[in-house]
């Protein structure tokens, strides 16, 4: 008798990631104040775009809308977004505690801003732009190229 060992073959699928962060609602063609290195459009095509936080300067709805427009213009099959420390209205508890003092000088404080911000990132406009807002937890995706991605 002979033993037969079965090996599973793991497929290697080439996958391009585009990682950006700290855009602070500026498009790559704008140079944010104090910035020394800003990418230029068009950004390269990617299988996965991951925006790693600081979508805005202070978390206003107008800033989120500008960032969503930018993300919608990028050629990527999967566009993932996580909030950063500047995106204060996406953390409702923190916003209620600190938002008023942080947004006082802009006149941007609004009791309903956290709900409006969440609706923007979880609603139809984000879906139409191909953007998925990631909240805490584990998220799994199957990419168009067949690769599987798990974000924890």
Give the label of every model feature segment.
Residues 1-78, 87-89:
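N-terminal active-site segment of His-dependent metallophosphoesterases
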Residues 7-17, 139-151:
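Beta-strand-turn-beta hairpins that frame and shape the catalytic cleft
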Residues 16, 59-61, 110-113, 128-130, ...:
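A short linear-motif detector with a strong N-terminal bias
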Residues 26, 61, 96, 139-140:
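A generic structural micro-environment signature
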Residues 39-53, 124-141, 149-152:
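Extended, compositionally biased low-complexity polar/Lys-Gly-rich tracts
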Residues 69, 73-139:
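Active-site neighborhood of divalent metal-dependent phosphoester bond hydrolases
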């Amino acid at each position: 008798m002979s033993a037969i060992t079965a090996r599973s073959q793991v497929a290697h699928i080439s996958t391009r990631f585009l990682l950006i962060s700290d855009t602070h609602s500026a498009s790559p063609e704008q140079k944010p104040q104090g910035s020394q290195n800003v990418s230029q459009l068009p950004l390269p095509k990617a299988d996965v775009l991951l925006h790693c936080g600081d979508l805005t300067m202070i978390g206003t709805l107008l800033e989120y809308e500008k960032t969503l427009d930018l993300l919608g213009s990028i050629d990527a099959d999967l566009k993932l977004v996580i909030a950063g420390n500047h995106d204060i209205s996406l953390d409702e508890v923190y916003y209620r505690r600190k938002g008023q003092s942080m947004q006082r000088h802009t006149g941007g404080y609004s009791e309903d801003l956290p709900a409006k911000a969440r609706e923007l990132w979880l609603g139809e406009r984000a879906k139409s732009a191909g953007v998925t807002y990631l909240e805490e937890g584990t998220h799994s995706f199957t990419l168009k190229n067949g690769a599987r991605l798990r974000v924890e």
